């Protein structure tokens, strides 16, 4: 019996896709946040730099060198009562052209009473015709806190490249005290370059970003608003239901990163990961 060529090609494609997962939890012990259980698999790894305070820092490393179509990665982090953890990445994540299936990235963050999670990865860079589906699920206790930021760059702007076509689906869900308090799905596909050029979407920007701050209120928004005149790009701020959100767009990654850092400085006493400062 001869193998079906299409089926054989699909099997080869699947066998060559990258897989990676990191799962761990942290607990407060003797006044310090310490790593507890840890699981790593595939090409995703995590490193724990020397702590600068009583919190814990974790840095994710993708040894595959980037994300391609059909790759699947997962991150799960749970913070125990009173613990504090800052999560970042060793480098900007590159998502390459995907002729077939989209890449998939699942992120699950859980914080118990009094815990704090800061999710501060470096930017995600989408190459032309990249395809990725990302899902971020957050479950906070009523007294837990969160600082979450994401930057997406459409093309290698430092090299003068722009993303013309592709697919980007970004699904966020936030639960607080067992209730769903925020749900959003962003979907850009097809002629992404043309859509980003639309004044009602990104007005020609090549980089977008979002910062979600829990708890957050109007006073925090006013503190951030005072720094707006120095921004290199554009930003919008709002606060409702006990949390605050800032949205950004800029012509390049460096400008958006600078604006994001200004907001993070207003929003949290947690120091930025050292790699953000390089």
UniProtKB/Swiss-Prot annotation:
Entry keyword Cytoplasm: yes
Quaternary structure and partners: UreD, UreF and UreG form a complex that acts as a GTP-hydrolysis-dependent molecular chaperone, activating the urease apoprotein by helping to assemble the nickel containing metallocenter of UreC. The UreE protein probably delivers the nickel.
GO molecular function terms listed in the Swiss-Prot or TrEMBL record: nickel cation binding
Pfam families assigned: UreD
Protein name: Urease accessory protein UreD 3
Family: Belongs to the UreD family.
Organism domain of life: Bacteria
Purpose: Required for maturation of urease via the functional incorporation of the urease nickel metallocenter.
Source organism phylogeny: Bacteria, Pseudomonadati, Pseudomonadota, Alphaproteobacteria, Hyphomicrobiales
Main localisation: cytoplasm
Key words, A-Z: Chaperone, Cytoplasm, Nickel insertion
GO CC aspect terms: cytoplasm
InterPro entries per the UniProt record, alphabetical: UreD (IPR002669)
Species whose genome carries this gene: Bradyrhizobium sp. (strain BTAi1 / ATCC BAA-1182)
Subcellular location per the Swiss-Prot or TrEMBL entry: Cytoplasm
């Amino acid at each position: 019996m001869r193998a079906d060529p299409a089926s054989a090609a699909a099997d080869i494609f699947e066998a060559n896709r990258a897989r990676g997962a990191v799962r761990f939890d942290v607990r407060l012990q003797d006044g310090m946040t310490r790593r507890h259980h840890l699981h790593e698999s595939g090409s995703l790894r995590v490193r724990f730099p020397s702590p600068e305070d009583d919190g814990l820092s974790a840095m994710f490393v993708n040894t595959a060198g980037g994300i391609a179509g059909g790759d699947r990665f997962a991150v799960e982090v749970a913070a125990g009562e009173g613990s504090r953890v800052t999560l970042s990445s060793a480098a900007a994540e590159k998502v390459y052209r995907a002729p077939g299936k989209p890449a998939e990235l699942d992120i699950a963050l859980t914080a118990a009473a009094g815990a704090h999670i800061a999710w501060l990865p470096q930017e995600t860079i989408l190459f032309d015709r990249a395809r990725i589906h990302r899902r971020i699920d957050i479950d906070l206790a009523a007294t837990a806190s969160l600082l979450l930021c994401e930057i997406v760059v459409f093309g290698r702007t430092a090299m003068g490249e722009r993303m013309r076509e592709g697919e980007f689906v970004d699904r966020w869900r936030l639960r607080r005290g067992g209730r769903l308090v925020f749900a959003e799905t962003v979907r850009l596909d097809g002629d992404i370059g043309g859509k980003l050029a639309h004044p009602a979407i990104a007005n020609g920007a090549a980089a977008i970003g979002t910062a979600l701050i829990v708890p957050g209120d109007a006073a925090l928004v006013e503190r951030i608003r005072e720094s707006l005149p120095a921004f290199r790009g554009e930003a919008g701020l709002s606060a409702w239901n006990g949390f605050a959100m800032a949205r950004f767009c800029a012509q390049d990654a460096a400008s958006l990163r600078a604006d994001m850092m200004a907001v993070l400085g207003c929003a949290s006493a947690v120091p930025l990961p050292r790699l953000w400062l390089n």
